Structure formats: C-alpha cells, structure tokens
C-alpha cells in the first residue's frame, strides 16, 4: 500500500506541539489521571501481566507519560515529528523512559506480537478519512499484539453530521500563553461526514487578536459503533465500549 503522508495532520500537530498542553486546563493533572485511569482499565480487562505498551498515536505524550510514570514499558509513535520530540523532552524532564519515533499508524515499525497492549487515544483514528483506512490501522494494532493482548481506542462520540457548510466554534476557555491572557478555541467546518479543524489562541480584551493559529486538519465523523465493528472485522474478540474511563468513549478488544 502506498502511504499518504497526511500532510495536513503533520502540519497541524507540528504547529500545535509547543502549546498542545493548553488543550487541557491542567495538563499535568490530566497526564496523572489518564495514567491512573488507563492503568486501572488495563488491569481490569487484561490482568496484571500487561507491561509492554505501544502508544501508536502518542502525540506529545499525554497518555504515554502517565503510563511510563507507573512503570509500564512504553514505546510511542506518531506522524508528527515535533510531537514525538516534545514527548521525548517531557519524558527526559520527568526522569522517565519513553522510546518514541515517527510512524504511520497504518504501517507500524513493530515486530508481530511484541506488545501486551496497544493504545490509540484522543480521537486519533478519525484522522483516517475512510473506514477502509481505519481498518488497515486496526489490523496493524492487532499484528503488534501478543495472543491475549489488548487494544484501547478512545473516540469522540459523534452524532449526525450537520449540513455541509456549517461552522462550529468549540470554546476551551481561558488560558495563559507567554504571560498573555487568552482563550483557546477550535473552529470546525463541516463538509458532509468530513470536517476541517483548526485551533486558535485569541487574546482576551478588545483586540481579540489571534495570537496563534494552527493549519487546518481533517477528521472523519465515524460513529463509535462503526469502529467497534471494524475492530471485530480485523479479528479482535470481546470488543466492547467502556464509558466513564476517559473523557471520551473507549473501545477495548482482545487479540
């Protein structure tokens, strides 16, 4: 298969990487609670033998850092070189071991059966713009797992897509960037089941100056139930939805 470099995804996350932490009101606290939540989920579903993890959509390390801090052996990968570099720098700053490299989730640099669990969190898979592409990625996740190993996918819970041309603004609230008070927001522009997204940091006050803006990237508003069906189609067993673990629905499946 010839890989599309997904230039818009790389450009978006390379631009966002230095200030990705602003997506969360308290990134450090979120790293900790997501690490706790995922560790509890891994133990509850697959037992205490899960130690070798692959975070195949690592980004700047929100989940990988929390799990590495709990003693898991984490290898992370992402399409965005800047995100991988930041995750590595954050791990070093914390005294953690986190191996990271640039890779497409549809073609992972991993030996078959080399992981106890694979993670793809934070609505990353819908950057793949068709069910066929998502299925390829899920098959790669399955290939990486040992028999009995588990896959964890977190996704936005999409409803029906609005009319094409609809624009939505998602306000993330007040933030501070380099000493300046601002607001963080996402701009969504719909075109059928596909929508384009950009982040903006906007100064508070009368000027409403845009301090920072990412390039746009694109998502596929795929329902959670469809991704669960695709997991089953590639060979995952006991696929089910878990709510209340993270801030988005989670799917788990076992090789």
What kind of region is each of these model predictions?
Residues 1-59:
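Conserved class I S-adenosyl-L-methionine
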Residues 60-72:
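Conserved SAM-binding loop of SAM-dependent methyltransferases across substrates and taxa
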Residues 93-107:
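Conserved SAM-binding strand-loop segment of SAM-dependent methyltransferases
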Residues 110-117:
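A short acidic, Gly/Pro-enriched loop at the edge of an enzyme's catalytic core
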Residues 152-222:
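SAM-dependent methyltransferase
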């Amino acid at each position: 298969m010839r890989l599309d470099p997904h230039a818009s995804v790389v450009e978006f996350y390379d631009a966002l990487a230095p200030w990705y932490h602003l997506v969360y009101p308290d990134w450090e606290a979120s790293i900790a609670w997501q690490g706790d939540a995922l560790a509890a989920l891994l133990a509850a579903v697959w037992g205490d033998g899960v130690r070798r993890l692959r975070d195949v959509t690592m980004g700047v390390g929100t989940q990988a850092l929390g799990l590495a801090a709990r003693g898991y052996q984490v290898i992370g990968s992402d399409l965005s070189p800047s995100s991988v570099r930041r995750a590595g720098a954050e791990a070093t700053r914390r005294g953690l071991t986190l191996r990271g490299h640039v890779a497409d989730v549809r073609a992972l640099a991993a030996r078959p059966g080399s992981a106890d669990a694979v993670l793809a969190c934070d609505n990353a898979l819908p950057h793949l713009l068709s069910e066929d592409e998502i299925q390829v990625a899920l098959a790669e996740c399955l290939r990486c797992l040992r028999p009995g190993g588990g896959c964890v996918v977190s996704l936005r819970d999409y409803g029906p897509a609005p009319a094409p041309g609809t624009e939505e603004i998602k306000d993330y609230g007040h933030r501070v960037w380099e000493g300046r008070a601002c607001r963080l927001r996402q701009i969504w522009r719909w075109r059928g089941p596909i929508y384009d997204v950009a982040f903006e940091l906007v100064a508070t006050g009368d000027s409403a100056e845009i301090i920072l803006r990412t390039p746009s990237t694109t998502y596929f508003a795929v329902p959670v139930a469809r991704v669960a069906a695709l997991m089953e189609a590639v060979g995952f067993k006991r696929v089910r939805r878990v709510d209340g673990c993270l801030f988005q629905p989670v799917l788990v499946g076992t090789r």
